[in-house]
Curated annotation (Swiss-Prot):
InterPro entries: AMMECR1, AMMECR1_dom_sf, AMMECR1_domain, AMMECR1_N, AmmeMemoSam_A, Uncharacterised_MJ0810. This is Protein TM_1551. PROSITE patterns: AMMECR1. HAMAP family: AMMECR1.
């Protein structure tokens, strides 16, 4: 697996242990100390070395006591529970690139002029439906396209503009 940043190395160790041995490992002294002190939403994204998506799962708000556990659980889910893909097999591990995104708290958007698909991710909400799109996604160059995809993910009709919109930033680690 490929990734240099310590947060990414933690995600890689988690995925390798889970995929190879079925073990959920606990964070230890090799995990950066700040991950034990911080809570935030986090996404773990897996790509093949050819750039194609292989898995992406995350949380936009913290659900665990600390970021080390948030990354751990989302790393396992990205490798094994993304409904778009079969679980990652041990044979694939050498050809997977891992990214970890740490999300800022979402803030309400009053006007779409406050959005920028390169800088901000979006969350669209209507009733119990919710769709999220991370920022700076290849091929997503306009606010309209970003909102269209987020609505699609939520199961909200593209033409329905009666939605709540939130934006967030990410710290992206590779």
């Amino acid at each position: 697996m490929i990734g240099e940043h310590p947060y990414v190395k933690w995600a890689i160790r988690v995925i390798e242990n889970y995929v190879r041995y079925g073990k959920v490992i606990e964070p230890d002294e090799s995990v950066p100390e700040e991950l034990f002190k911080r809570r935030a939403g986090a996404f773990v994204t897996l790509h093949k070395t050819d750039g194609s998506l292989r898995g992406c799962i995350g949380t936009y708000l913290p659900t665990k006591p600390n970021l080390a556990l948030e990354i751990r659980d989302n790393a396992i889910a990205a490798a094994t529970q993304d409904p778009r893909f079969p679980p990652v097999s041990p044979d694939e591990l050498d050809d997977i690139v891992v990214h970890v995104d740490i999300l800022s708290p979402p803030e309400p958007v009053r006007d779409i002029s406050e959005l920028d698909p390169k800088k901000y991710g979006v969350i669209v909400v209507k009733g119990w439906r919710r769709g999220l799109l991370l920022p700076d996604i290849e091929g997503v160059d306009t606010v309209e396209e970003q909102l269209r995809i987020a609505k699609l993910k939520a199961g909200i009709p593209e033409w329905d503009d009666d939605v709540e919109i939130y934006r967030f930033t990410v710290e992206r680690y590779k």
